[in-house]
Amino acid sequence: MTMKPFNLDIIGQRPHLNIYTQLSFCYSLADNPNADATRQSAADTLAQGLKALARHIPWIAGQIIHEPSTEPRNSGVYKITSWRDAPPLLVRDLRVGENPSAPTMQELRKRNFPMELLDERLIAPYVTIPGATAGANRDEPTAVFAVQLNLIEGGILVTFVGQHQVMDLVGQLQVMKMLDRVCRGEEIPEAEVALANREREGVIPDLLGDEEEEEQLREHSEKQTVKIPPAAADTDAAQHDKEKVKPVVSPAVWASFSFSGQSLAALKAAALETATSKNISTDDTLTAFIFQSITRARSSRLIQNQNPSPTTSCTLGRAVDARRYLNIPATYPGLLNNMVYHSHSLQETVSMPLGVLASELRREVDPTTSRIGLYTRALAARLRQAPNKGSISPAATFNPSRDIMISSWAGTGGDCYGMDFGMGLGVPVAVRRPVFVPIEGLGYLLPKHPNGEIGLVICLREEDMEVLKGDEEWRKWTG
């Protein structure tokens, strides 16, 4: 299917977002007397559904291309062009005997589906950071969206990946919900199709440009400005940005934790005792608890190394969906997330009452007090004016040794655990993020399970992780 080139959202023009977001849905085949037929039917259903989705939304089957600029220190333009008649679907048989390194459904269940058993190199069609994993094919076209169906003993793992310059997790989930509809023979509402295919220019409103806005924006803008060394000023912008976000491979490690519904309710109740806002959410409380706990685990190392001193700030970067702050429908399948920052001294971070910190987090996302809409309009305005889009990044001032960045997918659980894609497998028993190269200080709260459980995957250097796992307060609340 041929289509004219499709533009990306302006905030998707940043080169460092040339990565993939992965979600793996784990389906059980236990007690299925027709398992072989079900496996084949599942693959056929997904293949037909992807073709149907592309007929409604042609760009979903496209590829992202980069048009370099001839001007120095200019990152060029990224856009979507025609590629296939449907997004790629890979089917891999990973059952015992075919690939001994693949987990079985029994093993996954026994260990509560840990990230460490779900290797992106095995179960995902594209790795998170292209070229960062040994063996990754750099010459492969950059797909907008792709799916891999993995056959394992006792189940099926379906991994969906979305290219992050095109869509954030909320946008990717909307694409998956539309795929779920067509796989089940349902129609996608016309309004959702029109919204998906709308021109991206102008989605984010312009700034008003008054003095009050400028003052509010100054600190947030500084957090997202990459400081390019003078020696690098004449290098290619995209190459410099790629080097800037190169992951820390060692000695950082990933680990999985879980918080039961009962534990989360008790943690929130404890936070409410010291909260300055009675509107704090479970997500606010859990994110604040994670920030405090990790900072506490790092504190002895940081103080011993005098980096930082007790008065130097530690920062929590919290990814936020900006749609509702800009009056953009939640069903918009593009890229509209931003980040808010919370900085305190090392001593303040570990000693502050949990409820006070959770209340601070609430103020930044409460629509009545939040400035996320303003921050996002300012981000778009800066990017429109900046020749080198790589000079603006949410992680520009991120120090992985003492800061953390958290993306919460917990609120997507209701949607994720309700999607069966017409495969005849029922709903997933678990939804996870596959493991990828270590990036110290990065974490995700996973989609909330129907039983109330929320999982956490976090990457820390080994010595900090061991301290965290042994921390009495941490162990009290985690599974």
Stretches with model-predicted labels:
Residues 1-212, 269, 280-302, 405-479:
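Non-catalytic N-terminal regions of enzymes
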Residues 2-6, 66-90, 193-269, 314-320, ...:
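Short amphipathic alpha-helices and their capping loops
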Residues 17-32, 74-103, 247-254, 315, ...:
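Acyl/amide activation-and-transfer machinery of modular secondary-metabolite enzymes
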Residues 24-29, 146-150, 255, 260, ...:
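Adenylate-forming
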Residues 136-139, 246-247, 394-396:
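Short Gly/Pro-enriched turn/cap motifs at secondary-structure boundaries
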Residues 171, 248-251, 255-263, 277-285, ...:
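Short, contiguous, pocket-lining structural segments
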Residues 276-347:
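Hydrophobic, mid-to-C-terminal alpha-helical segments
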Residues 335-417:
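Helical lid/core segments from catalytic subdomains that handle acyl or acyl-like groups
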